[in-house]
A protein has these predicted regions:
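Conserved, function-critical positions that sit in or immediately flank catalytic
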Residues: 54-178
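Extended assembly-interface regions of large multimeric machines
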Residues: 1-28, 34-80
Length: 178
């Protein structure tokens, strides 16, 4: 199902809670794909789990003690550690949080006739109600968007759109949906 209408928090076998930021969604797989790898890392920045190439991107949020999990866990809710706001165990995650930062750009339509084939465009701005977000756009051999990676998450966004023309790509024959 669509990432937007799904539950997307997971508790792994080490009691680490992660949020799914990308579920393998692409123009070819608009509803995503099954996850094949368990996210087990505690890195502060989002990353893929494992080596399957399932297209998932995970962000580690926190680790919860089994004793706290047992009290409040359900299929509808995921408990947060009781000392989340003050405890040192999760301070690095709290300190790394950016209100309204953009972590992922979803490609819904790759477009047609975009720029130069096999070229990478850097510092492409993400316009919206926040500021500072940028991404790198890779145009594939078919002159379509091959990938988009956020390189600066910016802050204070509630929505954003990749501005490919301001990023140096010439006006395409058909605009992509990002």
């Amino acid at each position: 199902t669509s990432l937007y209408s799904s539950n997307y928090y997971v508790l792994n076998s080490d009691f680490r809670v992660c949020i799914c930021l990308k579920n393998g969604t692409s123009p070819e797989n608009p509803d995503g794909k099954p996850s094949l790898d368990e996210p087990t890392f505690t890195d502060l920045e989002p990353k893929s789990a494992g080596t399957s190439g399932d297209g998932y991107l995970w962000k580690y949020l926190y680790t919860i003690k089994p004793s706290e999990l047992i009290k409040f866990d359900s299929t509808e809710f995921m408990p947060v550690p009781s000392d989340w706001a003050t405890g040192s165990d999760n301070s690095s995650v709290r300190d790394n949080a950016v209100d309204g930062g953009i972590k992922v750009v979803v490609i819904q339509n790759r477009g047609v006739g975009l720029g130069t084939a096999n070229r990478t465009y850097t510092r492409v701005p993400i316009k919206g109600d926040g500021s500072g977000a940028e991404c790198t756009v890779v145009v594939n051999a078919d002159q379509q968007i091959g990938s988009v990676d956020v390189t600066n998450q910016g802050s204070n966004y509630t929505f954003g759109t990749v501005d490919i023309v301001a990023g140096g790509l010439p006006r395409p024959d058909s605009y992509p949906q990002l």
